[in-house]
Amino acid sequence: MSDSVEIFTDGACKGNPGPGGWGALLVCKGVEKELWGGEANTTNNRMELMAAIRGLEELKRQCDVQLVTDSQYVMKGINEWMANWKKRGWKTAAKEPVKNADLWQQLDEQVNRHNVTWKWVRGHTGHHGNERADQLANRGVDEVRGYKQP
């Protein structure tokens, strides 16, 4: 029997591109784990993807995962676009290279390790897990910019 895990993810960027951060809150059997990180020059979409990738990478064995995001980009990529990108060799319908293909490929690899269901929530509406992930993403931005949080 595999563990059931909820992962709440968020990305943040100060400028787009600019310094960015990602955050993931993992919850399993009432135990929480916080993850965050950042990059000096990135985009909000890359940080949204990184949050999901890092959250899934943290799981050491196959799990039933509910991944909760406020990113329409991540949701549409996973549910609508990725299958066709893969069929076309990571090209769009216009035969252009898929933006962030490196991260989409990493996410695809991680998703295939688990049984993942995806849930979209509207950001900044008081959803506890989403708000925590947002705080973690902003911590990632702050650390990249040289601000340390207590």
From Swiss-Prot:
Localization, UniProt: Cytoplasm
Biological process terms in GO annotation: DNA replication, removal of RNA primer
CC cofactor: Mg(2+)
SS bonds (residue pairs): none
EC number: 3.1.26.4
Any one of the GO CC terms: cytoplasm
Cofactor note: Binds 1 Mg(2+) ion per subunit. May bind a second metal ion at a regulatory site, or after substrate binding.
Limits of the RNase H type-1 domain: 1-142
Record: residues binding Mg(2+) 2: D10, D134
Gene3D superfamilies: Ribonuclease H-like superfamily/Ribonuclease H
Catalytic reactions on record: Endonucleolytic cleavage to 5'-phosphomonoester
GO molecular function: magnesium ion binding; nucleic acid binding; RNA-DNA hybrid ribonuclease activity
Residues reported in the UniProt entry to bind Mg(2+) 1: D10, E48, D70
InterPro entries attached to this UniProt entry: RNase_H (IPR050092), RNaseH-like_sf (IPR012337), RNaseH_domain (IPR002156), RNaseH_sf (IPR036397), RNaseHI (IPR022892)
Keywords: Cytoplasm, Endonuclease, Hydrolase, Magnesium, Metal-binding, Nuclease
Domain of life per record: Bacteria
Keyword hit for Ribonucleoprotein: no
Recorded family membership: Belongs to the RNase H family.
Role according to the record: Endonuclease that specifically degrades the RNA of RNA-DNA hybrids.
Subunit structure: Monomer.
Protein name: Ribonuclease H
